[in-house]
Amino acid sequence: MKFVDEAIIRVEAGNGGSGCVSFRREKYVPDGGPDGGDGGDGGSVYLQADENLNTLITYQFERFHIAERGKNGRGRDCTGHGGEDLILKVPVGTRAIDNDTEESLGDLTTHGQKLLVAKGGFHGLGNTRFKSSTNRAPRQKTLGTDGEVRSLKLELLLLADVGLLGMPNAGKSTFIRSVSKAKPKVADYPFTTLVPNLGVVNPRPGQSFVIADIPGLIEGAADGAGLGVQFLKHLERCRVLLHILDVEPIDGSDPVEAARAIVAELEKHSPKLAGKPRWLVINKADLMLPEELQERIDRIVKELEWEGDIYTISAYNREGTAELALKLLDFIDSLPPEEEVDADAEVEFKWDNYHQNANDSINEDFNDDFDDDFDEDDYDVEIIYQR
């Protein structure tokens, strides 16, 4: 199935049902009071994470999603039926963003987690709500409020512990093949990797972590050049980044300049991402003699002023990859657990005080001198019509 990690949809919550104006009229009860029921609340729209999904391609073809409207109230104090909530299934790792305000509404990072993205309208009030000692036959009601409407941008961010960075043909896909059972395409030309790849690494029995490989970055990527920039967001949830550096580039370029370009693009795209723990991994060590290799590594470390972790591997021959995987596992285990998120996140809704405000505004209009236009039986007085 085609990998789609971004989609824009429009969600509309259901409107609230209106209240009803009705009076009790039964045999032997000629002067029954008001019995108009309230309307029903409109259905809300939720996103729910589903581990069985891995792409947002469905929402590229289904862009409009509308929840059910609440039913109107009826006589005999019958409350209208509430609208059914609409639940949209999305892959685990999906982030919801308001496309108009750029506000992040929340992330869905665990299976079954729900996120409220559009709240249904509140129900209107029936005339029973407005009866009082001075207004015994009220003909007032309130309408249901409109449901919330949002334009949503859905972004799928892969859930991985380790992210791979590097220029095209640095050996990222070869590395992920050497430490996991993932089989991304490998070839001797740039941009062989066109979409992110995930691999599960098992350095020890019963212990594992997930590694993510994205298309290679080039200079100017933060401004839209190449393919990697649109996939950098997939590294935001990674706990450590591996900067794969080709020690002997096939085009004869300087590894130091390549490393600086990657760091510059990372900082330009997201300072937060650039601040994550980053290990330097020198790849293709089998292409050089040991003495030349050590001289090259010393120069790289000196010119980059690198003070962090550095490892030398040959992903093609699987030299040093197992040891690196073990060190990654130990490092990830030593990190503090990530903060838990609420299972049911909510967003602000502008109608939270609607009912109270509606009651207050209408009741302020009633006083002892109030005279309804239709006041035949306001005071339980029987009106007899004669020809």
Swiss-Prot record:
UniProt xrefs under InterPro entries: G_OBG, GTP-bd, GTP-bd_Obg/CgtA, GTP1-OBG_CS, GTP1_OBG_dom, GTP1_OBG_dom_sf, OBG_GTPase, P-loop_NTPase
Keywords: Cytoplasm, GTP-binding, Hydrolase, Magnesium, Metal-binding, Nucleotide-binding
Cofactor annotation: Mg(2+)
Major localization listed first in the record, in broad terms: cytoplasm
A Gene Ontology molecular function term of the record: magnesium ion binding
Domain of life per record: Bacteria
UniProt family annotation: Belongs to the TRAFAC class OBG-HflX-like GTPase superfamily. OBG GTPase family.
HAMAP family, A to Z: GTPase_Obg (MF_01454)
PANTHER family per UniProt: DEVELOPMENTALLY REGULATED GTP-BINDING PROTEIN-RELATED (PTHR11702), MITOCHONDRIAL RIBOSOME-ASSOCIATED GTPASE 2 (PTHR11702:SF31)
Protein name (Swiss-Prot/TrEMBL): GTPase Obg
